[in-house]
Regions:
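N-terminal membrane-targeting/anchoring modules of bacterial envelope and secretion proteins
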Residues: 1-117
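Generic serine detector
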Residues: 2-5, 37, 71, 114-117, ...
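Hydrophobic core of alpha-helical transmembrane segments in multi-pass integral membrane proteins
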Residues: 28-32, 51-61, 101-104, 148-161, ...
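Membrane interfacial helix motifs at helix-loop boundaries and amphipathic/re-entrant anchors
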Residues: 30-50, 106-148, 200-225
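Generic multipass alpha-helical transmembrane bundles of integral membrane proteins
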Residues: 64-181, 187-194
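C-terminal transmembrane-bundle signature of multipass membrane proteins
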Residues: 154-166, 175-252
Length: 252
């Protein structure tokens, strides 16, 4: 008996998906029950990254709880395993592009951010219009956007470690692909959730501008499309990790 066939018989699939659901439910509860800021408009910028971290924690917990219990009989495999052979490349590339967009938006927001009406730096957008100056917020400068960048960086490290564990583990190729897809899905939530929060918050501020003309229309269109795409991507990633069997059957 090979190590892969032994692991297949001891993988506790009955607990894997429920633990992932528990992580997502914890993320929803944290966002709904925890007041990250006394300013209601800022809640979105903190709650969405927190949700993504809870989802990733659920996937990590599921991997620890449901991982195979190896038998004392082990057979070495000659074929080398590589992480890229198990990762859904199209999804990973699409999510990497969104992570780059998130970084660009945060950099733009940080460079254009100003102090708010209370003199606190990096929390508002100051604009000079013919009718007068405007001070709009919240604007996702570094003060508000650090949870998005920090959560994405932390989740990227966790995803890389989990993918390595999955690749080196003794189990069938299909099981590795399912586990790797779930890890990428969790990372996708960590990317798309803050991307939606940042792009949506910026779009609301841009919509409130009383000037800017064509530049306003272009920026608003780009931010709206980004928020919409990130929302769809986030829902897809949740489906990948919360409904793995349905996704596998649809792909087969």
């Amino acid at each position: 008996m090979s190590a892969a066939s032994t692991a297949e018989g001891t993988w506790r699939t009955w607990i894997d998906t429920p633990v992932r659901w528990a992580g997502a439910a914890a993320g929803v509860a944290v966002g709904a029950l925890v007041d990250f800021s006394p300013e209601p408009d800022v809640q979105l910028l903190y709650a969405f990254p927190a949700f993504g971290l809870c989802v990733m924690a659920g996937v990590l917990a599921a991997d620890l709880v449901a991982r195979p219990r190896h038998s004392w009989i082990r057979v070495a495999e000659v074929t080398p395993r590589r992480v890229r052979d198990h990762v859904p490349r199209a999804l990973a590339a699409f999510l990497a592009a969104q992570a780059a967009i998130l970084t660009v938006l945060v950099v733009i927001a940080a460079r254009t951010a100003s102090a708010d009406s209370k003199g606190r730096p990096g929390r508002a957008l100051a604009v000079e219009c013919p009718a007068g100056s405007q001070l709009l917020g919240p604007w996702p400068g570094l003060y508000y956007a650090w949870p998005a960048l920090g959560g994405t960086a932390l989740g990227t490290v966790a995803c890389a470690l989990l993918l390595r564990r999955v690749t080196l583990r003794s189990q069938t190729h299909d099981q590795r692909r399912i586990q790797a897809r779930a890890a990428v899905g969790a990372w996708g939530v960590l990317v798309t959730a803050p991307l939606f929060a940042v792009s949506f918050t910026m779009a609301v501020v841009v919509l409130s501008l009383s000037c800017a003309g064509a530049a306003k229309v272009f920026a608003l269109t780009a931010l709206t499309l980004t928020a919409f795409t990130s929302a769809l991507s986030g829902c897809h990633c949740l489906g990948v990790l919360l409904l793995p069997q349905a996704y596998t059957e649809a792909r087969s």
